[in-house]
């Protein structure tokens, strides 16, 4: 598809879709696009109902609606899709709002006022007979728009399915459970806490899941329908040890597993690389991941040790 624009009302006279300028400009741009390439449909992202929106929807071939999961309210014979949706807020590895560090929980339970959680959006579009699907804002976190803190030292957005380093947040596994046919199950959060009742969520595409704490079953849950039901919630009284999630097929066979261990005191660093060899060429680049682990090799999720890196034969660039 060729897009004529996104939320263009903000750049037009009057600043909204009631401006007559918007339809004339979009008609002109649509004609120009069709003259250059008539083989692909045109679209645009609209973020407000009312005004000349009906006229705009008649100009393009495919109607893009931003942040309105209930697109049944739009009266048009054109195909409809979510051109920008969700804007859920989360920080990788954080499981409660952390005001001091300006971080949001990795549970899928917070979104901007005009958006929705990831699960809410997915469920809405799965249940819609009108929509072709939706684009999520955003796949990656990015520098800028640190909504809703919007002040120093926050400098990165919180919308991403993965963070700015490319590491998946927990919500990544919800999407995986929806669109990947390979059996999987994912536990959140980590299992290194002090005490109390912990909200444990599982994402899985298996027919059923079962959670174990130190070998004791905490119950089996069955997939009732595709959608947000791919998320399973437990409340678990914390006890140090091993948390295991099993995923089973319809016949009860174990086909997927995820394990979280309680970490001990930080004892060592573990490095891994995205390449097996590095060229001496000046433009070669390698990404090194560093994990803080206890003596048994378990990731220490709460470690805040100060680490200094030095490189011989290369340069640290970020």
Predicted ranges, named:
Residues 191-196, 277-286:
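Short, solvent-exposed loop/linker segments at the N-terminal edge
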Residues 252-264:
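Edge beta-strands of extracellular beta-sandwich domains
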Residues 202-203, 246, 283-300:
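Beta-strand-rich structural segments
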Residues 263-281:
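Low-complexity, acidic Ser/Thr/Pro/Gly-rich terminal tails and inter-domain linkers that flank the onset
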Residues 1-225, 231-238, 242-254:
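Extended substrate-binding grooves/exosites of carbohydrate-active enzymes
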Residues 238-242, 283-285, 304:
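Extracellular Ig-like/FN3 beta-sandwich strand-entry sites
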Residues 159, 210, 216-218, 303-317:
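Short, well-ordered beta-strand segments
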Residues 221-223, 266-271, 309-318:
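Short aromatic-acidic-glycine turn motif
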């Amino acid at each position: 598809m060729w897009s004529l624009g996104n939320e263009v009302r903000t750049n037009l006279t009057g600043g909204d879709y009631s401006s007559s300028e918007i339809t004339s400009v979009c008609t002109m741009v649509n004609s120009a696009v069709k003259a250059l390439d008539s083989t692909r449909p045109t679209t645009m992202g609209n973020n407000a109902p009312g005004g000349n929106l009906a006229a705009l929807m008649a100009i393009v071939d495919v109607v893009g609606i931003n942040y309105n999961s209930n697109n049944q309210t739009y009266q048009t014979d054109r195909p409809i899709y979510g051109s920008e949706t969700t804007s859920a807020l989360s920080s990788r590895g954080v499981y409660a709002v952390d005001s001091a560090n300006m971080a949001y929980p990795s549970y899928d339970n917070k979104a901007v006022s005009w958006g929705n959680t990831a699960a809410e959006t997915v469920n809405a579009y799965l249940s819609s007979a009108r929509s072709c699907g939706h684009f999520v804002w955003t796949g990656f976190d990015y520098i800028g728009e640190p909504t809703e803190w919007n002040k120093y030292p926050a400098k990165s957005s919180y919308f991403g399915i993965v963070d700015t380093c490319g590491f998946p947040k927990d919500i990544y596994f919800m999407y995986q459970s929806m669109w990947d046919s390979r059996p999987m199950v994912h536990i959140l959060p980590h299992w290194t806490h002090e005490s109390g009742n912990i909200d444990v969520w599982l994402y899985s595409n298996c027919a059923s899941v079962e959670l174990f704490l130190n070998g004791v079953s905490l119950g089996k849950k069955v997939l009732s329908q595709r959608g947000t039901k791919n998320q399973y919630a437990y409340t678990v009284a914390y006890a140090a040890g091993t948390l295991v999630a099993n995923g089973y097929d319809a016949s009860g066979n174990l086909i997927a597993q995820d394990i979280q261990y309680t970490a001990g005191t930080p004892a060592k660093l573990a490095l891994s690389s995205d390449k097996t060899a590095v060229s001496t060429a000046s433009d070669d680049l390698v990404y090194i991941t560093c994990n803080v682990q206890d003596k048994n090799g378990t990731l220490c999720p709460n470690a805040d040790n100060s680490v200094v890196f030095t490189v011989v034969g290369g340069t640290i660039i970020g």
